[in-house]
Amino acid sequence: MKRLIFILVISSHSFSDQIIEKFQAANGRYNDSDYIGAIQLYEQIVSEEWQSGYLFYNLGNSYFRQGMFGQSIWAYNKALKLSPRFENIKYNLEIANSKIKDRVTLPPEFFLVNFYIKLKSYFTFFEWLFLCGLLVFLSASFFMFSKVLISNIIVVRRLILILSFSAFVFHLIAFDIFLEDSKETHGIIIFDNVHAFSGPFKGESTRLFTLNEGTKVSVLQNQGNWFEIFLLSGEKAWIPIEKIKVI
């Protein structure tokens, strides 16, 4: 398992001194093997709606050390959404996933699909938007430059075409991420032996199957204190809200 992150990389306007002190105190408790204490402090920071890949990464490590594998998988997935290029998160997530009972292994994707998935997940949604804006700005700048340039105007026009096409592709990727986040919500089962039912009522519903801790599911809708979920196997069922954490 990869090590803890001791420095929270943030701007001075993002996290207050109090949050930084809590983060450092949580790291200290982790180093003293007080994982419950570390979890409590990290969760306090999360409850104050501060978002950081490093925060969720350290929280995931604390959950893992405490044997709370479902919670650690949830935290690592949250961290990966915020810091998609941080390799330690991917490594620790793989270790945590290996602890899942009856883990479902999907067949390998077609190489072009796999390439697109990796490309799309390399940046966050807002990073893709920033790149789009940057390319549009460069295209406009070179276009204005081409109006006063006499020599090599063909080269400049080709460069404008490449930048414009790249901006268009990046916009499509950003839009795809937006649609995916809007239409599909995922969650992690955080308890073991969670019973899934045919409807959102225990007494009137049939028990369909049992889910293991750490299983990743798609959340379709909620009704009262229940979530309707969808599994990779194609099955649908209802489980109590407290049994799952939404990513």
Positions of the model-derived regions?
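Membrane-embedded alpha-helical segments of integral membrane proteins
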Residues: 105-147
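SH3/SH3-like beta-barrel superfamily modules
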Residues: 209-242
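Internal/C-terminal transmembrane anchor helices
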Residues: 155-178
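Beta-loop motif signature
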Residues: 31, 189-219
